[in-house]
Regions:
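P-loop NTPase catalytic nucleotide-binding module
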Residues: 57-182
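P-loop NTPase switch module centered on the Walker A-proximal segment
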Residues: 1-43, 47-56, 60-62, 111, ...
């Protein structure tokens, strides 16, 4: 957010585009307002996008804005990702918000990267697809670290990924429940 009004409010009030390249692909991020006071601005950005990333506070979780953004995405047949933000804020809880997302939006919500939290501090992030842990430096560069002991929680998270994939396709569903997807 760079507009003086946005800086004052600490939220986006206008749609903005931030282009960048990833390999040979140009990606345009379209930042839309999250507050429903600016729903018209958000709708413009959603219509122009191929997919949506909906930011959800790690402290307050799913709210009316989250539900309306998701409905807008589904009504327009947009692929949707959720990003749990504000994990550095006191009383934030990624896992509580993840469960809330699943109960609100269904079993297709699955974790891809999850935080490893110790003493209310994020120590690293675990990519559940490649089963590796990473930290990030001040420049945003990833550094692989040893996988922390996640106990039984890791099994539940990887099962959630498999279940979500199985929910999207009949053949994957059959493969998962035959035991071949574990």
């Amino acid at each position: 957010d760079f507009d003086p009004e946005e800086i004052k409010r600490k939220v986006s009030v206008c749609t903005a585009v931030a282009p960048f390249a990833w390999g040979s692909t140009k990606i345009n991020l379209i930042d839309t307002p999250g507050l429903f006071d600016f729903a018209g601005e958000a709708a413009q950005g959603v219509r122009a996008a191929e997919s949506l990333l909906i930011a959800v506070s790690g402290k307050s979780g799913v709210d009316v804005g989250t539900e309306k953004a998701y409905k807008m995405a589904k009504d327009l047949s947009k692929a949707t990702l959720f990003f749990v933000s504000k994990l550095d804020v006191e009383h934030s809880d990624f896992y509580k918000v993840f469960e809330e997302l699943k109960s609100t939006f269904g079993p297709s919500v699955c974790p891809i990267v999850v935080p490893y939290v110790e003493d209310q501090q994020v120590k690293c992030y675990i990519n559940l697809i490649d089963m590796k842990a990473y930290t990030y430096d001040d420049k945003g560069e990833a550094h692989e670290v040893d996988m922390p002991d996640f106990g039984h929680r890791l099994d539940g998270l990887t099962a959630a990924v498999s279940e979500a994939v199985a929910e999207t396709d009949e053949s994957l569903f059959e493969k998962y429940f035959s035991g071949a997807g574990n």
